[in-house]
């Protein structure tokens, strides 16, 4: 469908951080797909760099931004390999206050490189740490990969980000409420690192 309503909890979280900050907030949305998080951040006044390797998905995200009334927001739409983009941003010295990651379980890079989330996530988070501003607010990591639990994601964020930058990490399954039964339909996992400025 291109819409992930279970992510609303994360959208609310980052919107609260953006609106509560006493400064402009730069957001990097990686593997950004159809742009739900991008739209949420734009609605709160952030500057957003939206990156996805699929031209079609980026176009869909632009349409979603227009339908949501934020097409004129401070956004750059980038069609690129997310790993290569982050590596270039490190070299350029560009820094972000919030990074949102929604990486696929499996994929291929532009030169046939194979991506397995379980094998590559730790190294990728290490790259992401290098594009965080000194007073970064958050890193939000989502996964729909069955072999990657919330506790493993929490460990990775703690080992890479808390060790280097302080702050704290929380992680949990995310899901959708089921009206008929009162239960919750599991829909993946999320882990959130909050920097010192993101904990206020």
Give residue spans per PLM region.
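Conserved SAM-binding loop of SAM-dependent methyltransferases across substrates and taxa
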Residues: 34-48
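SAM-dependent Rossmann-like transferase core, predominantly class I methyltransferases
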Residues: 1-22
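S-adenosyl-L-methionine
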Residues: 54-100
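C-terminal catalytic and target-recognition region of SAM-dependent MTase-like enzymes
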Residues: 136-200
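Short strand-turn motif at the edge of the Rossmann-like AdoMet-binding core
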Residues: 104, 110, 142-146
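A short glycine-rich, Lys/Arg-flanked "PGG" loop and its adjoining helix->strand segment in the class I
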Residues: 120-134
